[in-house]
Amino acid sequence: MKKDHLNSTDFNLWHTIREETEAAAAAEPMLASFLHQTVLRHDSLDSVLAYHLSSKLGSPIMDVRALFEIYQQALSVDTRISKCVEADLKAIYERDPACDEYSLPLLYFKGFHAVQAHRINHWLYQNGRKTLAYFLQNRMSEVFGVDIHPAARFGHGLMLDHATGF
């Protein structure tokens, strides 16, 4: 049964994700290193997202570290992206019966990953870095199987379930 965090005045999404991840690392030692690298060593949700997306979308021709820095820049310059990320995580938690923790979409749901990668691609596109946005759109399509034009605009609170055939 899901906890009703959203109606609590002291709810902190980042702290909840860290607590869930700490519990998962303790419960499943085989994933402890992955969970530490991906979530627990970071000090913010933005840093986790930038790291996780750059790890997934980096390639031999797109350095993971350079991509991480680009993602960090987008998230720090345009705080609306971070607000949308949080709204999307909350929407998935509320609407998806298979999601009983906020950390699950962040770690494992390719639909969530595709939407967040698109948000940053859109920022790049809007800020004159269209060639990079197109490159990352293509990379996102290769990795997640989701193809979204970088000029497309989304609202917040999105849930792209499974993202197969989208």
Give, region by region, the residue ranges found by the protein language model.
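Terminal amphipathic alpha-helical/low-complexity segments used for targeting or macromolecular assembly
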Residues: 1-139
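Structural signal for interior beta-strand "rungs" in well-ordered beta-sheet cores
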Residues: 141-166
